[in-house]
Amino acid sequence: MKYRPNFSTTESTVNIPVIFAKVSGVKDGKVSEYWSSIRELITEDTMVIKSFPYIQPLAANPIKPYVTEFYKNGRLQKAKIKNHPAYAYGFLREEIQEHILDKLQILIEQKLIRGTFENGTEYTILSTILNLPKEILRMLQKFDFTKKNPKLIYINPGEKVISLEDAILTAFLNLAGFDILFFIPTGYQNIENFYNRKQMEEHQIGEYLYDLNVPDLTRVPLPKARQKSWRDILFRRE
């Protein structure tokens, strides 16, 4: 089996090298090449988000009324969560359920999200991560820790600010082993406002462009010639 570079285990902890990056601007202002470069990153284990918010804050969430029961004295109450009638992850592999809950504990205790333990944001974190969309759960279920990371690509060409729930999702998935890539042709700040400290690298690749329309990336042609680019900096570990 071919292991990903820098993959390791320490006792019962799996250490997964991941990317969390924001790519600002458009190289040389060439829009068609910009979309082609993003298209090149998409694999069968890639999810692309281009409409916001991805997680609707007011959408039905069966577990939300109960989350205050699930975090006591600085610890996630795993047994109580798993035995609760509203717990929806029982169909996942046991190791994936444990992985989700372990990373949820870390996300809260490290206070990665602004407002944690100050205004109840920890409960928003709990309700968000315990009610993940089906497509995310399917990606987690088939996650092989020893191979290449699944990717989440988030494209925001306009002025909409990412929601708190989407910021929680991306921070969690990065802890869980996903590569997270934000493509922001405008260069605007979006996700940064939700973090207590710098979480991601920013790569300025070119001039800022506005009001771009995201095409159907499955129909975008791949680059004709492979040249060294900002992608090599992002994925230098592969």
Enumerate the language-model features and the residues they cover.
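Short hydrophobic beta-strand segments
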Residues: F7-G25, K148-P157
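Short boundary motifs at domain starts and secondary-structure transition points
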Residues: K2-T13, I136-K147
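Conserved N-terminal ligand/cofactor-binding loop architecture of enzyme catalytic domains
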Residues: M1, V14-G25, S32-S127, E201-R237
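Phenylalanine-focused residue identity feature
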Residues: F7, F20, F52, F70, ...
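Histidine-anchored nucleotide/phosphate-binding helix
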Residues: Y3-S8, D28-E44, S163-D179
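Active-site and donor-binding regions of nucleotide-sugar-utilizing enzymes
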Residues: I125-F143, P150-F194, K198, E202
